[in-house]
Every structure is written in C-alpha cells, then in structure tokens.
Amino acid sequence: MLHVSASKGMAEYFKNILDNVTELYTLADDCRKSGYDVTDHVEIPLAKDMADRVEGIVGPKNVAERIRELVSDLGKEPAALEIAKEIVEGKFGEFGREVGAEQAVRTALAVITEGIVAAPLEGIAHVKIKKNNDGSEYLAIYFAGPIRSAGGTAQALAVLVGDYVRKNMGLDKFKPTEDEVERYGEEVDLYQSEVTTFQYQPKAEEIRVAVRNISVEITGEATDDVEVSGHRDLPRVETNQIRGGALLALVEGVLLKAPKILRHVDKLGIEGWDWLKELKSKKEEVIEEIEEEKDDFNYEEEEDLSQYEDYEVEAVTKFIGEVIAGRPVFSHPSKKGGFRLRYGRSRNTGFATDGFHPAIMYLVDDFMAVGTQLKTERPGKATCVVPVDSIEGPIVKLNDKSVLKIDTVEKAKQYRDDVEEILFLGDILVNYGDFLENNHTILPSSWCVEWYEKILKSENLEYTKEFIENPDQKEAVTYAKLTKTPLHPKYTYFWHDISKDNINVLRNWLIGGKYNENNDSWELTYNLEDSEIATSKRYLELIGCPHTVTAETVEIFEYYPLLYSLGYDFDKKQDIVEDIGEKLQNTKNNMHFINTIAPFEIRRNAYIYVGARMGRPEKAASRKMKPPVNGLFPIGNAGALVRLINKAVEEGKTDEIEISNVKCSCGNVSLYRTCPFCGSSVEPSGPSRIKLPIKEYWYKALENLKINKAGDVKCIKGMTSKDKIIEPLEKAILRAKNDIFVFKDGTTRFDCTDVPVTHFRPVEIHVGIEKLKFLGYLKDIHGNPLENENQVLELKVQDVIVPESCMDYFFNVSKFIDDLLEKYYKKDRFYNVNKREELVGHLIIGMAPHTSAGMVGRIIGYSYANVGYAHPYFHASKRRNCDGDEDAFFLLLDAFMNFSKRFLPDKRGGQMDAPLVLTTILDPKEVDGEVHNMDSMWEYPLEFYEKSLEGIAPKEIKKIMQTVEDRLDKDSQYEGIGYTHETLKIDEGPLVCAYKTLGSMMEKTSAQLAVAKKIRATDERDVAEKVIQSHFVPDLIGNLRAFSRQGVRCKCGAKYRRMPLKGVCRKCGSRLILTVSKGAVEKYMDVSQTMAEKYNASDYIKQRLEIIRSGIDSLFVNDKRKQVKIEDFFK
C-alpha cells in the first residue's frame, strides 16, 4: 500500500518504480548468493520513508514504527526528543549507559536530519559520561568534522538533544573550569586564523557565556593539525589540537542559531536555556544579517512609496569580497546596468536557480554557460545559470556606436564580436520562493509585461495577446493615452538611470531632429567631435533606447513613444510642454519630471539591479579517485607509478601488502570468500601482511572470464578499510575493458551540477513520443493527448534528464554489468543495450556527497547541457538546493551488485557519500524543507506587484501566493505545479564555460578583465585589484609558507615530514623529492605584477607585491652568485 497521497496515475508510477527496484534487488541478491562477493546479500537496505532510513543508518532495531507514530502525533523535533528519551529508558533494548546515550543522540539527530545526511554517523564521534571536579557526572558529546553536513540548526538541536538525554538519565550539568572556558575562545580564534572563517564571528564574552551555561560538554576529536599554545594539557580535554567539530556545533550551531533554539525550547518546554534570550537580544541584528540577509535596504521617504519617489537600496557587497582569477564579475553590487530583478519562475528555475536571457550568456564571452554557478548579491548567496528567453535580454552598444536590443540567440551570435559595451545585462528571473526561503524583504518589481497585463485585466480593458507580447510603437502610445494606463513596458526606458537635467538635455537634442519618411525613423545630426552631441548621445544610450549610427546621423526607429514620453507630439510635430524650465525646477527627480511632461503615465523600468560574479563552472564528468583506478584490488608498488597490474605481471613484480586472506585447503592463499583455485568456501581473516600472488590471480581471473588478453588495468596500492577485504580482480578487468572507473565503495558514478526542471518538451530530451507514452507521459500540461515533440509535459518527481556524456558513460557501465552477469556470475545479460537511447526507463541512484542515503530515480532522456536535470523534489530529497552544487548518479543495479560497506575507508567521514540506505518512494514531506517554499503558481497576482513597492516581508503576502507547502499531503503535491515564464529550450546557450576552455592563468585573467571592460555595470580596475588581493596574494604567501614547511616524498609513495638523516628514502633507498616546487611558489607572481601595472592598481597593492617578490627572490636567488650573460661583459 502506498504511504503517500497521490493520484491514481502517480500511484501507478510509484508501483512501477517499486516493481523495477524489486526486480533488480532480486537479481543482484541471486548474484551475491554465488559466494563471489564480500557478502552473500545486497548491502543497501531499502527504505520507504524517513523512519526506515533512520533505522537503516543508525538504528536501533525496530525503531522505525515508533518514529512514524511519534512524528505523526507530535511533529519531527518533539518526536526526536521523545525517541531519545525512550532509547535511554531501554524501550528498544538494554544498552550500557554511555552506549544508550550515544544511541539516543544519534537516532534523534537522524530524525532531525530526515535520515539522509551522514552527520548522525560521522559527525558524532562518541558520547561519554564524565565527572565534574565535585564528583558529579555529566554528559559529553564528541563532535567530528562531518557534523557540518547536518547544518547549523541540526548541530544546535544535537546539543539540545544531549541536554534532554542528560536530564532523563539523571546526570548533573557540565561544570567547566576557567581554563576550559578560555580554551574554547582560543580555539575559535585559532580556527579562524589558521583554518577557515565561520559564518558568524562570536565575541569572546559570548563564547564564555555559552560554555558556562550549556549543560553538556561540547567537545570532540582533533580535526586540524594546529595546536593551541595557551590552554594546553587540560585533564578533561584529550587533545591540544583544534576540535573543529565541537567549534562548528558551538559557533554555527548554538550561537548562530540561537533564535531557532529558543523557539524549540519554548515550544517543547525545556528548562535551562533562558540565558540564550539575553545573548540573542545583544546580537540579533548580526544573526539576521548572516542568516537572512535581511533589512539590507532603506527608503529615503518611507511615508510615500509612490513610483515617483527616489528609491535607494543598500548594496550587499559580501558576494564580491573575494574574486577568483579567471572568473568574471558580471555586475558590481546594485550597479546601474546590472541584472534587473524580475519575479517569476520558469520550468527550469526555482529552488535557488535563476533565469537569464540566453543572449547574455553568449555576450559575456561564454563565461555564463548552462549550469554555471554565480555568486549573487540577493536574495541568496548563489545561483545557477539557466536560459529563459521570455524575459528581457541585454542592450548593447556596438563598435559603430549603434545601440541594439539583443533579444534572440541568433542576434547574440551575429553581434558578439562587434560589442563595445553592454549597457544593460538583461533580467534575472527570481521566484518568490527564494525570497521566502531567505526571509529577504520583497523588493520592488521591475516594470514588466506580466504586471502590465494584470493592470489591464483589473480595469476590464480589452487587449490582444499580440499587443501584450509585441505591440506596435504607435499602438502602444495610443492605447496608453486612450485608456489612461501606463505606457507599455516595451517602450518604457530607463529614465531613472539619468538625472532630470540629463533628460532635459536629451529632450532638447531629440526635438531638434527630423522625420525620415524613407525609412520611417527619427533622424538626428551626429558629430562625435561635438561634446554636446556626444553627451546627449550618451544619455540616449543610458536610457536603453535602440538607435542606429551612420557617418553623420543617428536614426531612431522607436521614435514615436520616445518623443511622446518627452512631451513632443509627433503627429502634430509640436512641443506640447509649456514652461519646461518651471517643470524642471519644480519636479523632485527624474521620474517625477518625465511623468510631468509625458501625456501618459511612465513607470520606473527597474528598481533593483542585482550584482553577480562567476562561481564554479558547470560540471558533468565521471567520478574518479585520485589517481583513477578500475578496481579495488590492491597491488602495492608492483604496478609502479601507473598502477597497472598487467605491467606488474609482465615484469614479474609483486609486493607485500596488508590484506585479509586465508590459506585454503588446496594449498593456495585465497583473498576471497570462494577460493578462485578450487572453488571451496573459505572465510578470509586478518588483515595481515603477505606477499601478494599477483601473477596467479591475474591469469586465474582471465581464465574465469574467458579472456585471452586484457588491456591496461589500473588497481589501487592498498585498502584503507578496516578489514582490508578486497574486490574480485575480475571486476577491475571488466571495468577496464569497458573504459569505466570505480569509486571507493565499489560503485561507478557520474557527477553533474544540479539543475531543477518541472516541465520539459520531448524534443529537449531526445526521446520518442511512443517511448514517453510507455513511461507514463500520456498528456501535456493542458490535458491534450501527447502527439508531438514540442508539447510541454510535467516531469514526474523521480525522473531525471542526464547529460549526453552521462548517457555515454552509463552505456559503458551497462556493458560492464552485462559482462559481469554473463562472464563472472554466469547469468543472462540484463541491459542488452545497443545504443545509449535504450537506457531510457532504467533506474539510477541520485546521491549528494555529504549524505549516506540514496534516492531512486529513472532516466527519461538526456540533454546537451552539462548538468543533471531533475525535479526540485528529487534534488531536495538529497538535502540539496540548486545553487551550483554537484551530485552523483549511478546505475541502481551497479550499486546493488558492487557496493559494499566493507570497502569504505576506516577513517572519520569514510561512510559519507555511500548509499547506506536507499529511499524508493519520494515523499515531499520528508525532503529538504527549502523546496516547500518554492512557488507553484501559473501567474503572480496584481497584489504581489503592488505590495512589492511597499518593501514587505515575504511571509506577509504568503496568503496570496501558492507554494509547495500548500500542496503537502494532497494528491496535488506531485502534479499541477505551475510556472509563470516560458522558455523555448532548457539547454539553449553556451554548453561549456569559457573558464574550462582557456589555458594558462594569464589567458583566464585576460579574458576575465576583457569581460569586465565591456560591461557598464562592472569596474575593471576594481576587479583586477580584488583578484590580486583575494586570490593571488594569499596564494603567493601561502605557497611561500608551505615551501618553508614542506615535507619530502619518494617515488615509492613514502612521505616524510622532515628529510631523514640518511638523505634517502628509508623504505627503498631512492632519492627524495620536494613536495612543493619553486614553480608552485611563484606561479602567480608575474601575472599579478603585470595586472597591477596594466590596470593601475593602488600603490599599496604594488608595494605588497614587491615585498612578496623580494621574499621569493631571497629564498631562491643567491645574492652572492649572480648569473650573467656573455654580452653583459661587452656593455
């Protein structure tokens, strides 16, 4: 029985997925029962919901049903506390006190994090019961680095859970000594200076207050090789090194999330946390700024919010504080000409992904490709670039000084080499849900056609769709005058970007022109040498009015609305404004002035310009270990640096390695559970050091596979798992045969950038109509039967559209799995695909690196973009949003057959990024809550646009908006999600970011600054200075420091912190090599100084570079022995 609310069609879809999962599970289980694998069963438990995931990942046994009951009755957070209480009370088995407390904290944290992230497993090292100096007992939670994956709120709640467990166990509070209190302050400062910064920088007194009042000890294991110098060798602190996990829980958990903890404390009635109220009140403004980037703007005159008032927004500069070399700044914070804020959601945006016109993606020299990450000014910290061609495109000035609106990709490609300046970058389409998620005040909307149409509807005016989308210029003016409505957005220029005096200068110049009947244009005399004409021409450019420049004239084809906007009656050829000087003097600003002289209302085109810079480039590539290997079969140093087992066999080499093994009754050493030489069942023990019989295993594997000669097969040097149990060599040979690679857990993966999509056209995903019908896509969004490839269909929540290169790679993986079934397990081939398109309909797993739970998905097609398209719910099920992160896909049968927990590294974080449990059915209630804020409307109401002018909080208008949250627990939670803006093609635009195609750092930075030079909203000198200061200088200093502290290494793989006294490798006697080269130290030196000179950086920067140069020279250049050329003697 299906446990989620869904329509009959969706229920059938989920049943089909479950049936396919069961089929693959059964097949893989049969293969494992043959005894050739590490275990004789599939090692990935299936979970239908959060409760199953929690039990599967952290336990205890039989807890799932009770979690379901409690969550249903109480809600998630109260249920987590109650389940922790019941565990320590022994309701799920008898545990020792410390074991019970640890189990309680882990299980409660798993409930809070939906049983997806690895934090409950890896983020909590252990829980201990320790003693205060007065002899009383208290609880200590040992946090580890992976607690970061839980997020700040969950980190804080883990501490709250610990306090709740402590009370229920009758333990006393933690009573720290003064040295222990001060130790935290020292560690926080050291962490920020030597490791990385926190989101929130706490004051020393805040840390002291928190540590003295938190009832459990927040401690942890050492995470960084940096030691404290002051408060060392404390009896109850086991290490002198930084405890990174503990600091994260304290600073980014308890201190940063204080308001959220207080809400839970008040709601749950937990005592002992009142001290947080005082702490919160002292720093509430700081917390809100970091958490929500709220209140980052102000109005000059809040009592009058009409469109004629000046409007100022405070620029958010955080995103541009650090600029990486080779990654352009597209717009400085809130700079005129930047990305214009526009509200709405296209079918490929939302959930932190914003839409941009595909034309601008080409005009910035391909630095904005589909899937490229941008760091943005607002509403969130980052976004992902996707094309939406129904929003405003860029406005550019060409080399011949003409100004042109680039509204198609064809135009962008035609004129890209002729662009002198990008005057306006175009729109950035942001959905209401992203403002709601970030609790960012709703900023005034730009003047757009959807707002305009709402006004016409509200006044019951007649109009055609063609008029809304592309009105004739005369028709637009006539309609505005007759109906007394604002001028159509198409002909509303950026009057607010120039002053009222500038408008008057431009007006005087334009009125002096004449009408050219031959080409229906307004013609003006143009002379670049005339400063007055040049100034007026610049104002024409800045308002974004298209015009063509010839040798002696400027021709304006959109003359009709332009002239009428400036108070000139074109039809009567007369100026209709009286006393222009008086109006200029009596109006308060540009918008007031233009509305005074125009015969109709003119709205402000843009209120908000959003700044942005490039973050990470898009990614679509197979997952490889470093170096890439084909199998988890260790060969030590026998394969030399290239790690080729076939080369080791040819040269007769072997090596001693530590590995699980057993002596078989046949006399051979078996590394597997089934002896490959006699077929007997054995049980390897160990690990122990043995001389590996590489040659014997190699030829036996080839014999088993009936392969005469294999190509190059790359293997690992040694296992890092606890038992050091290995994978059969046959799998490595078959992977190499099919040109694929293995990951640490035995699976074969493909990584790609997460991008949302809720609707698609068959033509976009390269799948036939009949195949889509077979997969359950019978009707389009309008309810019409699916008949052609251009109809828009709603994506089912567990279907994914993979990159083309992923399909090619999975084609090879399917060949490997079929070979494995046929040649190794002696079973029928499963996939039997002859071309990549035949993989459509097969199941995969989607997984994020910081999690331990996978989600079942189904391939329904591929796109040319280097991104992984999936439903926002699907990404949210992996605890991800879509702001530029990347996750992995891998074939479900591959995971069932080849994954093993016993391959995972025996170190902290080793169980992250491994499918320890698999969710089969996606429940929207149990995914990352951020997606619940995504709006699901087909159009925004007029009230939204009007309210946006008031600068209200997003929650205040939630009642007039529709979000995913409103659909939960209803059949409509899976279907009928709307979008407001159409786009023709989801993978339109550059497919590869220029950053990935350029070679040297000099090439990258030159291209970066070339982009900055031609964008009006960017200051190239500032970009150059920021690149030097935030990237090059820290790298130069860091590499210089690393050189002086470096260790040495040997070609055999041995590493030494200091040079051995013998001067050679202690293992093999070979010459030792430096780990940091001279080239690594000075690689950015020349490019930094070249940039500083070329872009006239400040004297401070130039002098700092000179100091670094002298430091490098003092290290590498011998002052006493100076190399000279022979010609120097003849000077």
Swiss-Prot record:
Tell me its family.
Answer: Belongs to the archaeal DNA polymerase II family.
EC number assigned by the record:
2.7.7.7, 3.1.11.1
HAMAP family in alphabetical order: DNApol_II_L_arch
Q: What is this protein called?
A: DNA polymerase II large subunit
> What's the encoding gene here?
polC
Under InterPro entries, the record lists:
PolC_DP2, PolC_DP2_cat_dom, PolC_DP2_central_dom, PolC_DP2_N
Keyword DNA-binding assigned to the entry: answer is yes
Quote the catalytic activity from the record. DNA(n) + a 2'-deoxyribonucleoside 5'-triphosphate = DNA(n+1) + diphosphate; Exonucleolytic cleavage in the 3'- to 5'-direction to yield nucleoside 5'-phosphates
Lineage of the source organism?
Answer: Archaea, Methanobacteriati, Methanobacteriota, Methanomada group, Methanococci
Keywords of the record, alphabetical order, are:
DNA replication, DNA-binding, DNA-directed DNA polymerase, Exonuclease, Hydrolase, Multifunctional enzyme, Nuclease, Nucleotidyltransferase, Transferase
A GO BP entry: DNA-templated DNA replication
Cited Pfam families = PolC_DP2_cat, PolC_DP2_central, PolC_DP2_N
Q: What does this protein do?
A: Possesses two activities: a DNA synthesis (polymerase) and an exonucleolytic activity that degrades single-stranded DNA in the 3'- to 5'-direction. Has a template-primer preference which is characteristic of a replicative DNA polymerase.
Subunit details: Heterodimer of a large subunit and a small subunit.
GO molecular function list: DNA binding; DNA-directed DNA polymerase activity; single-stranded DNA 3'-5' DNA exonuclease activity
- The source organism is Methanococcus maripaludis (strain C6 / ATCC BAA-1332)
